[in-house]
Amino acid sequence: MIDTQNTFENQILEGIPASLPTKKGYDEHVNHAPKRKDILTAEEKKLALKNALRYFDKSFHAELIEEFKEELDLYGRIYMYRFRPDYEMYARPINQYPAKSKHAAAIMLMIMNNLDPKVAQHPHELITYGGNGAVFQNWAQYRLTMKYLAEMNDEQTLVMYSGHPMGLFPSNRNAPRVVVTNGMMIPNYSSQDDWEKFNALGVTQYGQMTAGSYMYIGPQGIVHGTTITVLNGFRKIKKSPEGGVFVTSGLGGMSGAQPKAGNIAGCITVCAEVNPKAIATRHSQGWVDEVVSDLGELTARVKKAQAAKETVSIAYEGNVVEVWEKFDVENIHVDLGSDQTSLHNPWAGGYYPVGLTLEESQALMASNSDAFKEKVQESLRRHAAAVNKHTDKGTYFFDYGNAFLLEASRAGADVMASNGIDFKYPSYVQDIMGPMCFDYGFGPFRWVCASGDPEDLKKTDAIACQVLEEIKETAPEEIQKQLEDNIQWIKSAQENKLVVGSQARILYADAEGRIKIAKAFNKAIEENKIGFVILGRDHHDVSGTDSPYRETSNIYDGSSFTADMAIHNVIGDSFRGASWVSIHNGGGVGWGEVINGGFGMVLDGSMEADKRLQSMLFWDVNNGIARRSWARNEEAVFAIKRAMQVEPDLKVTLPSFVDEDLL
């Protein structure tokens, strides 16, 4: 690996090389994506090759076609491994990027963070998290995009079609520097197999949420929300987390936050994971305390932790179904239960069935996808049956928005309520995140210190904490608990050692909090106390995502299957000052089940940045509160009325509540 600043700049500016780089081998030490489904016909495979070769000069086609054929045959996709860059992949300080526009340089920083091997799940396949959450489809797209970003000025906009850089178009300084779409399909063509087919053809990709939108900040990105969920789960069952047991699964890019969240909440977390590389990554990063591979040893360890009321997180190397079944036999009481396997992607490595090893599963999904699907559905039925035995004993189980209940129901598992319509278990958004956070406007605000300096992150933590404490002094009773939890979070952020990759922080905040924190950052930048700051959020937020099985699962007026909110949100962000915007298909629950979007905004200390953040952040939160209010969510009605008092130009249509006796 060559990594001088000169090499880095030259390869960025070069884009797709004028001469072919040396062919790169398949690195067995890296966590790779499983082989994808062989779904293309012979003619479609020719089309996939034509599509891949169009990035290169015709003189290279004869050599590359054999290589790309081999990749398509071996992996089900054409990743163009040869074109992986020779420099180290990580979020460099913003001043090291050879860019004319600081906004573009910030986006380059964020892209490289998403592909950092310490951060990304399958870095060589350009997958950040979730098994198939892609930044790009291939390395040619990466190289071309970085070249465009280096060349562009602040009067241009880069247009990204599902990882493909369509080009730089004239715009203006107030327009976004980049507009991203991922997986935008004609509605009738959005099934799992449609993703397999059109992704293999090289014409679309699944961007998950923050993968394809360049806003991932490692597992920290979900740990605050997971901590809120675990804490409030224990509050819901009126039990202290001390000595309580939380059983779940997954140690990937998002699910890997669970053990850390359990530690912060103060409980015993048992998190099952079948992939030893994922376990090793999270253990080495300090995101899980202990690793156990024997069920008997796990049982003894949990009983000991219960007796001592320890705070500890334990990774079990194996299938979570085995854990649920063993704990039932051993009569270990589980207080909270959930699941964070990637069931948005059930047939291509998102969920590994009990009874098969990781290697056996990967071989079967490649050789006989129908048989693998049967094994997954059989496992889901067994999984749900084991969970049901625990809930009969008092376990509080919730769906973590990963399509567990959805796919279990499709498999015929016993997860339906007596009415045959609803699930017997709630989504965490229905019970916790929706009414407590989203309806009041609280969601996963985040920022990245573009200098890469940990001292800048410390300073921004202190600034954010001071702002929240000032807000809390006059805040209404309805949001005091949220502010209290968030102040405690930011105060303990440094000691919890959350950073993996870029110097970033996540903090749940409402519109008032986000705007005041951003303004305080911008002032600190103007005064040269800190470097540039990149603002953003998860798509999993108040306004960003329409998802009937997760983000909008607590919308009960029938509109949870509509996507007006997410579409309006990205359009509104685009002309209110975002540096880049994105809109995706399927984030979280899966392709065809969701429309989700996000933004990034660069703060440079200017008055212009102050105006942009005020306008855009206010809209970015209150759009969703208005929609939730119209759905008759009382917490949202309260929040939008408050917002209208603060901003006289905001006039929102409020619902009239119907007397149930009239119906």
Labelled PLM ranges:
Residues 1-200, 204-215, 368-520, 524-536, ...:
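Long, compositionally biased, glycine/small-hydrophobic-enriched stretches that function as flexible linkers
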Residues 276, 318-321, 340-345, 401-407, ...:
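Glycine-rich beta-alpha junction loops
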Residues 268, 333, 396:
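Residue-level detector of anion-binding/catalytic polar loops
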Residues 151-152, 169-173, 188-189, 237-241, ...:
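Solvent-exposed alpha-helices and their adjacent loops that cap or buttress functional pockets
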Residues 245-248, 311-316, 398:
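Short catalytic-loop micro-motif centered on adjacent basic/acidic residues
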Residues 313-341, 345-348:
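Active-site/ligand-binding-proximal alpha/beta "capping" segment
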Residues 207-231, 235, 241-245, 249-309, ...:
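Catalytic or ion-translocation cores adjacent to nucleophile or general acid/base/metal-coordination motifs
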Residues 263-265, 328-332, 413-416, 525, ...:
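Short, solvent-exposed amphipathic alpha-helical segments in soluble enzyme
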